Every structure is written in structure tokens, then in C-alpha cells.
Amino acid sequence: MRKIILIFVTIVLPCLLCARNDDKSTDMLLREIDGIIRNRQTYGAEKEARISDLKKLLSEATSDEQRYGFCGRLFDEYRAYNLDSSYVYAQRKQELASHLNKQDYLDDAAMNMAEVMGTTGMYKEALEQLGQIDKKTLSDYLYPYYYHLYRTIYGLMGDYAVTEKEKKEYYRMTDLYRDSLLQTNASDSLGHVLVMADKCTVHAQYDQAITMLTDFYRKPSLDDHSKAMITYTLSEAYRLKGDKKGQKHFLAL
């Protein structure tokens, strides 16, 4: 189910957002979603076409630097779409990073592998993978990804923990890495707003989260993927608040 939601957020929602859905009724939006689902093969074909083009560019690349870049783009295309393939390209990134002898490339590839492990439920393996990264030498631009993975993995471990003691400890670690993310991301960035909204909902401050997300959504410079992330997070805030109408509307928006 988690994979289906991720695919919906990354593929289907951006298609709807292209048409300026801000003022449409929920029923109208849901009818559009029905149409999107009926034509899901079309959107899947578009995804596969992008992947095919990237694979062609990868095969024609003349340097390991170029190959690393194309493998990174293929990993991005495959994440939440085909986890086996995303792991393959994370491994290829790691091999190329070794040839290039670039530590930040090695760290990024290792985190890609940890991301796939965490998504497939291999939480301890993901933490072991992250534990091999030397935080002291980590490049500044990788810190948000690093903290995000720890926060996400510990959060999932908390969700599925058997004992209350384990659950409490995992959620404590989730809070620590959430706070680290808030300190790392720029205060006016999408990442900061999403993490802050997450923190608000955890502490039952639903209206504060909704206001924050709604204000950020109105920014004219947002791309469709960013809008999709915000509207999905808004739907979750409304769900936790117990507002089914709001949840339904923003899940459709």
C-alpha cells in the first residue's frame, strides 16, 4: 500500500496539478482522478519512455562522470516505481564513485542503497549502511538527505515496533533527526516546511500544520511535484485532525 501511495504522489498527482486545480470542487477533482486511473497505462508508458531515453544516454556516455550522472537520474526515475531497478542503479553509482574516487559520490550512492533498503522493510540493514558513512567528512549538500533517511527509517521502525519500549525509543530517535533536519534545511525551503508540518502533526497541532502548508502552496514558483508533496501532506494533516472532507479534497487536489 505504501508503494501505491508513493507512485500516486510522484506520477498521478503532478498530472492533475498541471491544470490549475486550486479552485475546483472535490467531486470534479475525483472525476479527473478516475480518468487518470483509467488511462494509467498512458502515464506508465510516458515514464518508461523517459527511462528508455536515459538508458540510451547512459550507453552513449563517454566518461564515468557522465555515467554517474545518468545513473543518478535513473535512480530518481525508478524510486517508488521499481525498487529492484533503483537498487541496481544505486550500486552502479557506487562502482562509478569508486572509480572516480569521490567521497561525496560514494556517500550519496550509499544513501541511495539505504533508501531502497528502508523502503523494502530492511530497516536494520539500512541503518548499517548509513552507519558506514563518516558524518564528519559528509558534504554539506548531503546532510538533509542523510538526516531525512534516519528520520524516515526510525519512524517506520516505530510504526512497526512490537513493544511499547521499542516504539518509544524509535520515535525518540525520529524526533532527534527531525530536529536535525529543521536545523539543516533553509527556513524558506519546501523541505523545512514539510518537516515542520510533520512535527506539528505529531504534536497534534493540526491547524498550525495546515496553515503553514497552505501558505507555502500559494507560492507561484512551485513546480508540480512540490505541489503534489504539499497537497498529500495536507491531506494527511486533515486525516489526523479527523476532517474527512478536507482529507478527501486535498488528496484529490
Positions of the model-derived regions?
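A "functional boundary" signal
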Residues: I4-F8, C15-L253
